[in-house]
Amino acid sequence: MVLNFKFFTCENSLEDNSTTMLKNSIESSFINKTLTNSIILTTFNDFSNWARLSSLWPLLYGTSCCFIEFASLIGSRFDFDRYGLVPRSSPRQADLIITAGTVTMKMAPSLVRLYEQMPEPKYVIAMGACTITGGMFSTDSYTTVRGVDKLIPVDIYLPGCPPKPEAIIDAIIKLRKKIAQEIYEEKKILKKGTRFFTLNHQFNFFSNLDNPKLTSSNQFFQSKKTSKVLLETSLTFKEKENL
């Protein structure tokens, strides 16, 4: 039982018909209305996560047929604008990169450089089987990167050949849930120069030896071991052709 404020006087007494003034009020009190319009009770982590999860700006990195499925999201049928996605052409304005398609050895340095130019915090969605494992090119192709997670850290894996637009939307929703549960202090910032490739790709990290002035620019080079194997294979193939 509550008393409505209009039934009180300055002398802290009730009016003559006060016996009928008591009722169950279904409305919130005047104090609660004032507080809810001026005060937000939350934590810094929740506020920062809330501000980021609904305004993801993706950098579209399409290298194969999977990107055609992502292009379907731009149309009115799926309309990815309702999720706050704003495609950007510059990595310095994006906080999400979607790798769609096969990643080759020559494209690996460019992908890593694009990821480094993105501001923190940043996220990665690996879209398609070719991006995640190399796909059908991983068995007999020495120029295919067998998993983009060997180059850059991946947050969401989206399998499929190719994935449907509905699956892409589901991956974005899962990424938003992951962002909502993050803790700001535990978010690890990627150190400059860190790489995620493994020795399975026979990558070595060297400075540019052609021009001593460009010591700060780094490139990927194929190791001598891999080059030797490829040379022996090509020579053996040519000898068989001559026979």
From Swiss-Prot:
Cofactor: record remark: Binds 1 [4Fe-4S] cluster.
Functional summary from the UniProt entry: NDH shuttles electrons from NAD(P)H:plastoquinone, via FMN and iron-sulfur (Fe-S) centers, to quinones in the photosynthetic chain and possibly in a chloroplast respiratory chain. The immediate electron acceptor for the enzyme in this species is believed to be plastoquinone. Couples the redox reaction to proton translocation, and thus conserves the redox energy in a proton gradient.
Tagged with keyword Hydrolase: no
Binding site for [4Fe-4S] cluster: 65-66, 130, 161
Protein name in UniProt: NAD(P)H-quinone oxidoreductase subunit K, chloroplastic
Reactions this protein catalyses: a plastoquinone + NADH + (n+1) H(+)(in) = a plastoquinol + NAD(+) + n H(+)(out); a plastoquinone + NADPH + (n+1) H(+)(in) = a plastoquinol + NADP(+) + n H(+)(out)
InterPro entries tied to this protein: NADH_UbQ_OxRdtase-like_20kDa (IPR006137), NADH_UQ_OxRdtase_20Kd_su (IPR006138)
EC numbers: 7.1.1.-
